[in-house]
Amino acid sequence: MKLLLRGHDDRYAVEQLQLALFPEEPMEPVAEPFSGDGAVSSLHTGAVWLTATAEITLHGKTGRSRRRLRTAEADVPTRRRLLQNTYYEAAMCLREPPAWGSLSGVRPTKLTTRALLEGRTPTEAEKLLRTRYHVSPERSRLCVEASEATVQAAQLLRPQDVSVYVGIPFCPTRCAYCSFVSSSIERFSGLLEPYLDALVREIAHTGDLLRASGRTVRTLYIGVGTPTTLSAAQLRRLMEALRTHIDLTELVEYTVEGGRPDTLDAEKLETIASMGCGRMSINPQTMNDAVLARVGRRHTAAQTVAAYEAARAAGYDAVNMDLIAGLPGDDPKSFADSLRQVLALDPENVTVHTLALKKGADLYAGRMELPSADDVAQMLAGAETSLRAAGYTPYYLYRQKYMSGSFENIGWCRPGTAGLYNIYMMEEMHSIVSLGGGAMTKINLPDGRLERFHNPKFPQQYLERIDDVLAQKDAAFRLL
């Protein structure tokens, strides 16, 4: 769909909304008037009034909208909201209202969290989403519930606190839906030991910086690809380095993303637990063996159950399990059965993701038929009903671009078991110091901005540029 801007250059605000509302229409920015299908977003700045108009033509039908506000009241966020609401209203002449209304960002809970922290009631925060951003009552409720968990988690934070993330960008094989930069052990097993050598250097260097800056580590998360691709001995080496070089005495949460059940055995799970980790994530994605095979996950539902039982025997305080709605070959009945099997295991956390088709994933090429948006909506609605009935509540929520049906990912927890790192990271509540290939350190600045520092994505690049990685850590800590 063509997009022409007149009187403003806030292309990002309008483009993101257009992608969310018309995901099946290819985006084509233009600089000149056009005929046929497309959208025009205009802004006229007068002495008294700031007037936004939008006109969208699609398949021979046209939707129009016009809004205005006083020029003196038009700061940048208000102007952006004016443009988006005008575009949204024009679009609603051509399609049914989406559940997320005019919101196009990945962190809708930031709005409700801010409202609660400013002293608004949950009812007032819900009303904000419904009236200002056209969000459905159901999604507004989910946002507020997740934000209430965020407010509770914020009470555990102190000004000197940070979280530490450690990335292990290796997996047994690549799943068809995955776009993470992760190297298959089948091809790159020779890089594991050199990668650990470099990572231990970064850990030691970061430990020195943490001590010098007076920062304390509140949560620690080991993730990215499949950390349990490492052997038990390699996991012990990694976690011993963390314990040796970084002060973990004030840690309130330690998580390892076990991920693929076929990489987990009793020895690894016992090793990880013995090193102080209390949270383990075991991610079946589905309990349907045929769907698992179709997306390239070389494990079975039975292996998931075995890994879970081994984790329980190892004594973890909390176990999370992930499911994905919208996988090829899945349907509402099969998805409901997967959730039923997961709930029968009684994990503390269940995270329900919606399939997001990203350019790096094999599924993006479109060679597999996917469930319809209606089927995915049925999966998610059924999951919410079942999880609430089992005593779970939402504790974090985020959206992704290119997600099936423009839905969301939701972390559900039993009382008192919310994943703190997930909240702190997703809500950007404090600085995240990240180590390893593909890791991104985020420094929260006093003025509310974030400064990002990216490590090289691929393991080989990370090895070759480890000196640059350490120098970049120095630069990041100068901002802390």
Question: Model-found features: residue ranges?
Answer:
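Beta-strand scaffold of nucleotide-dependent catalytic cores
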Residues: 167, 281, 349-353, 423, ...
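Key residue(s) within conserved catalytic/signature motifs
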Residues: 10, 145-146, 214, 256
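Radical SAM enzyme core and accessory elements
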Residues: 1-120, 199, 415-480
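A C-terminal junction/extension of Radical SAM enzymes
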Residues: 29-40, 360-435
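Short beta-strand motif preference
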Residues: 52-54, 166, 280-282
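N-terminal [4Fe-4S]-dependent radical SAM core
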Residues: 90-97, 117-164, 213
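Conserved non-cysteine loop/helix-boundary elements of the Radical SAM core domain that shape
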Residues: 182-383
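Canonical Radical SAM [4Fe-4S] cluster-binding loop centered on the CxxxCxxC motif
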Residues: 161-196
